[in-house]
C-alpha cells in the first residue's frame, strides 16, 4: 500500500478503459519513485515470501473456520476462494448485517464489512490478513457479541 502500486487484470477492453478512467480521475495512475524497483524485486525474488504468506493465510482461514464451527455453528463460513477475505453467512440471525456490523463495532470494537456493500445481503466479510493473535482476539469478541 505504501508503494502505491497494484496490478489490475481485465481482459475486456471496455472494462479496462473504465478502470483506467477511474484511476486517472482518482489520481491513482502514477507510480511513486520506489514502486517499479519494488515490483521487479517482488516478481524476481518474492516466491518464498509469497509461499509462506499463502500458507499463513490458509492457516488463519482454518483457524477462523474451526472457531465458527465450534463456537458459532449457526454461522457457516464460505470456502475461501483465492483471497484473504472470508464471507460468513449470518442469515440465520434474521437481522440486517448492517445492524450486526454496527453492534460488533460498538460493543466488540471489531470493524467488519457487511455484505450489502458488495451485494452480499446476509453476509459479513472478515479480513484474515493479520497476525493470528489479532484474529483470535477479534473472533472471541465476535463470539461474545453475537454468540
Model-identified regions with their sequence ranges:
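PLP-dependent class I/II
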Residues: 1-147
